[in-house]
Each structure stands twice: as structure tokens, then as C-alpha cells.
Amino acid sequence: SNTSTLPITSLAESFKEQGKFVGIHFFSPVEKMMLVEIILGKNTGDVALAAALDDVRAIGKTPIVVNDSRGFYANRCVGRYIAEGNEMFLEGVPPAMIENCAKMAGMPVGPLSLSDEVALDLGLKVIKATEADLVPNAINPDQKKLMVELVEKQGRLGRKNSKGFYDYPEKGKGQKSLWPGLSALQPKQLDPDTLDIEELKQRFLVVQAVEAARTVEDHV
């Protein structure tokens, strides 16, 4: 499966032998990301699970077994990380400070950069799907408005079309840089000297820890 918004159990309904149906979810970029989720559908059997574990270990990846639910495990936590970055952006925190505080907290890339890598249009599709499948208050309307502005009005899809939160130069012609137009999308801009860097760092860590605890509570 290529996305954590496709329920494995639903996909298996069209398969005659549902006990042999199992999800294997990789992360992008695949060549760098060691984690692989193995997703159990409602009727997945032990033989299918064992085969999936063997396959993932054979290619040198680290498998974890999760139950079928929206976002599985990892993307629920990653989604909260990205959402917190968007929340800071809407609060008026300078984009560069958002990115740097996240990296200072130990994250390999900032949430805005990660959004670009995942693709902003995909993020918007997930927001819309969540809103349709659950209830309107399951999503943050301000974050949806931000994604609609970036994707549908500005045509900024992320790295894949060389413009998202960042501008991407042609290969070999410099480094990516935050899009200067971002400030116009912020309802307000806060003075960086008034912001507590430690608080911003902790926010990134706490939201992911809380979401991880929720996945345990939800039996993911």
C-alpha cells in the first residue's frame, strides 16, 4: 500500500483469500527510511504476517506490526508533527524559526520541509478525506484554508513541482530557500525575540508523544 489513508481491510474485501492479504507500508525516501509498517487487516492470517516480516527483514528494513486504522502508527505521529508546524506558522512564528527549532529538537528535517517532500496536494487530499470520512471538526479549518491557498490558489505542490513552502532551484543551481511569499499567508507575524525556543522545541516533541500514546490506547 502506498498511503496510510487506504484501509487494508477494505482493500482485502475484493480478495478471495483475505487471510493472505496484508499491508506493507514504506516511507519516503524509501532508500533512506529503515522503518516499514506491516498492517494487519481484520482477516489477515499468521502465514501472511510471517511472510511479510521475512520479506521486510530480507531487504534490510525494520518492520513493526500495526493494526489497520487511519494513519496506521507512524503517519499519525508524523501528521501531528507537520500539523504543529502549520499551527506555529498560523500563530505567526517565523518559518525559519519553525524549521530550526524542529531540528534543534532532534528532528532530521523541519515540518515545512517535510510537508514539501510528502507533497502539499497529498496533504490537502488527506485533510479533505478525513473531513469527509469523519466529521468536520476532525480537521483544523485554518490549516485546511492554508493548504487550499498554497495548493489550489498558488499552485505550490511541494518539491515535486519545485515550489511549496520552499522554492527549489534547478538541479545543481543552488539550495532550496523558504518562499518569500509565506509571510503574506500568515495572519500575523510574531517578533522572534519574544518567542521561547525551548517551548517551541518541546511542542514538537510533546504532540508526537501524546499521539503515540493515543495509538496504544486505540490498539493500533
PLM segments and residue spans:
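N-terminal glycine-rich phosphate-binding loop for ADP-containing cofactors
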Residues: 1-220
